[in-house]
Regions:
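Short, solvent-exposed loop/turn segments at secondary-structure junctions
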Residues: 522-526, 560
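A short alpha/beta connector and helix-capping loop motif
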Residues: 529-541
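Gram-negative/organellar outer-membrane beta-barrel architecture
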Residues: 222-415, 477-480, 491-494, 506, ...
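Outer-membrane beta-barrel proteins
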Residues: 59, 339-345, 425-435, 559-564
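Bacterial Sec-dependent N-terminal signal peptides
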Residues: 1-16, 579
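C-terminal outer-membrane beta-barrel translocator/porin domains of Gram-negative envelope proteins
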Residues: 275-280, 393-508, 516, 524
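Interaction-mediating elements
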Residues: 11-236, 240-247, 253-256, 265
Length: 579
């Protein structure tokens, strides 16, 4: 066909295709071919394409028997469609039977290898085992073969081959045999990790890899399994995948290779300063916020936080989280938290938890925590006193990362903890003795995306301590950049607190976003019988640089409807360095 129009050089061509009869022309018109073309080659391609589409409709003997050039810009092609094949009889085979009668006149002789694994194909496709043939509309042949291969692949026959052989035409009927070579049914035997050259000194934690292999043990190898493996490796914040996983088939094993490189998952933020207090003594002030991950190649998470304003408050917190200890689904985490308020009291809390990993994102912990509090001034009053408390705790943690998003890598985080225990005080007031206590804390955060440019960050925080009596130095401290903004750090105290912390974020570019600050909270302090509503509001901006994320926030707050003063605006600047 291309040769027929090879010498035509008109700029615009019109193509008219007709059939040998009026009925055939109607069939051709129903296919809706393209009639306008820019050159002769396009016309030839269109005629060939139409012929292929006619074949798929059952006109397997269609042919062009007349080409006409009407004028310089108009061409005509005439098709003879032939008889339409309505259906196809596919011989699938039966365990112990000969081919059906419909094939007896055929000269084709089937061999055992050509009709292979018939029971397998019948089981997987849900076909009647008592029948040896399948009758399909001719137009469904392609979808039947594709769907069959897909089902085979889903059931571990990744190298299966399926095709029709010995195709014959008898009048308006097509006869064929289904040739099926299943190969060996493949399970995923091993997941192998390889690091890029730039991260050749890195290693993937052995406990993590063992749990991944255990999860997929005796799992059919198919594209869905490979996709799940790829998604599971995306849950680890300390590595990134440089390309899609690859499958290695050997006669005896099937392995999936995952290609990784080290991700910058360590964070540092802080400053240290010096100042003189009222008595002229040199004091430290500033803060340090450090988070390390997989530093000792065990997938561990270590966090260190220190903050001092030089006078009123000092906070020190250190924690470590060890997942998959002894290469089991068991995890261990521990924490120490020291808080000192002026020269009034100091609290030292220690906690240890043993956890079970449902998966890497979801963990359940049972633990023990204890707090020792010292009344530095030895007032031993009903509001401040030395005390010790102990709790048995249960904790559920869930987190989901969005590592494609460089500014907001944490998409969801949920932590729920409940503790049952008691407090012992030694003062001579009504708070003396042993008091049973219960507490619950809830922290839940999620990013809701309206579209790629607009996002709402919702953060819910709740704390409740149930006790017959309360003392000031056991109350929950909050306020500041990580809770209700617009208030000084840890300037508020409560036995019950609930807060909804929100940001509307407008993403200017992948490295820049603007956001609002709108926080609401309610708290109760039974040591002073005080209840109040809190409101925090403001604006902020975030900028991703080569080395981390720079955040600048302006916020103000109101306590129970107090007048808002511009002079109370709090400006916070954080530069979180990643390494």
């Amino acid at each position: 066909l291309l040769c027929f129009w090879a010498n035509s050089f008109a700029q615009n061509f019109q193509l008219k295709i007709i059939g040998n009869t009026t009925a055939e022309t109607k069939v051709i018109d129903s296919i809706k071919y393209n009639s306008l073309h820019a050159n002769a080659k396009a016309i030839a391609d269109e005629v060939n394409s139409l012929s292929e589409r006619l074949s798929k409709l059952g006109y397997i003997e269609n042919q062009v028997f007349e080409n006409t050039k009407k004028n310089d810009s108009t061409y005509s092609a005439k098709f003879n469609l032939g008889a339409q094949i309505k259906s196809i009889h596919i011989y699938i085979g039966r365990k112990s039977s000969s081919r059906p009668d419909i094939y007896q006149d055929s000269k084709v002789v089937a061999t055992q290898t050509e009709i292979n694994n018939n029971d397998i194909i019948k089981d997987l496709l849900g076909l009647d085992k008592s029948k040896d043939s399948l009758i399909l509309p001719y137009t469904e042949i392609e979808s039947f073969l594709n769907n069959s291969l897909q089902k085979l692949e889903q059931n571990g026959y990744a190298l299966a081959k399926l095709k029709l052989i010995n195709i014959q035409k008898k009048k308006n009927l097509l006869l064929a045999e289904l040739q099926f070579n299943s190969g060996r049914q493949r399970d995923l035997d091993e997941i192998v990790v390889q690091f890029a050259e730039s991260s050749k000194n890195s290693s993937f934690p052995k406990g993590h890899l063992k749990q991944m292999n255990r999860k997929y043990q005796n799992t059919f190898l198919n594209q869905e399994t490979v996709r799940r493996v790829q998604n599971d490796f995306e849950k680890f914040g300390f590595v990134s995948q440089i390309k899609n996983p690859e499958i290695l088939f050997t006669p005896d094993t099937t392995k999936v290779y995952v290609y990784l490189e080290k991700r910058k998952s360590n964070n540092f933020d802080g400053f240290i300063g010096f100042t003189n207090n009222e008595s002229g003594k040199l004091t430290f002030n500033g803060y340090l916020d450090l988070a390390l991950e997989n530093t000792i190649k065990a997938g561990e998470q270590f966090a260190l936080y220190w903050k001092s304003d030089g006078n009123n408050q000092r906070t020190f917190k250190a924690s470590i989280d060890l997942p998959y200890i002894f290469r089991s689904p068991i995890g261990l985490k521990a924490q120490i938290h020291i808080f000192k308020q002026d020269s009034i009291f100091q609290n030292t809390k220690t906690a240890i938890d043993l956890g079970y990993f449902i998966d890497y994102k979801t963990r359940i912990y049972l633990g023990y925590q204890a707090t020792e509090s010292s009344d530095i001034q030895n007032t031993n009053s009903s509001t401040i006193s030395d005390y010790n408390n102990t709790f048995l705790t249960a904790n559920l943690d869930y987190s989901k990362l969005d590592l494609v998003n460089s500014i907001f890598p944490k998409k969801t985080n949920i932590s729920i903890m409940m503790g049952l225990g008691s407090r012992v005080t030694s003062d001579l007031t009504e708070t003396a003795g042993t008091t049973k206590q219960t507490f619950i804390t809830i922290n839940a955060m999620h990013n809701f995306y309206l579209n790629p440019k607009n996002c709402f960050n919702i953060n819910y925080q709740n704390y409740f301590l149930k006790s017959d009596t309360y003392i000031i130095n056991e109350l929950y401290r909050f306020g500041g950049t990580k809770s209700i903004r617009g208030f000084a750090e840890n300037s508020l105290q409560a036995n019950f607190m609930t807060a909804l912390i929100t940001e509307y974020r407008y993403i200017v570019s992948p490295d820049l976003y603007l956001h609002s600050i709108l926080d609401y909270g309610y708290y109760e302090d039974k040591t002073s019988n005080y209840k109040a509503n809190l409101l925090g509001f403001g604006i902020g901006v975030g900028l991703r640089t080569k080395n981390g994320v720079l955040k600048l926030n302006f916020s103000n707050g109101s306590n129970d409807g107090q007048k808002i003063l511009f002079s109370n605006t709090i400006v916070t600047l954080n530069y979180n360095i990643e390494f």
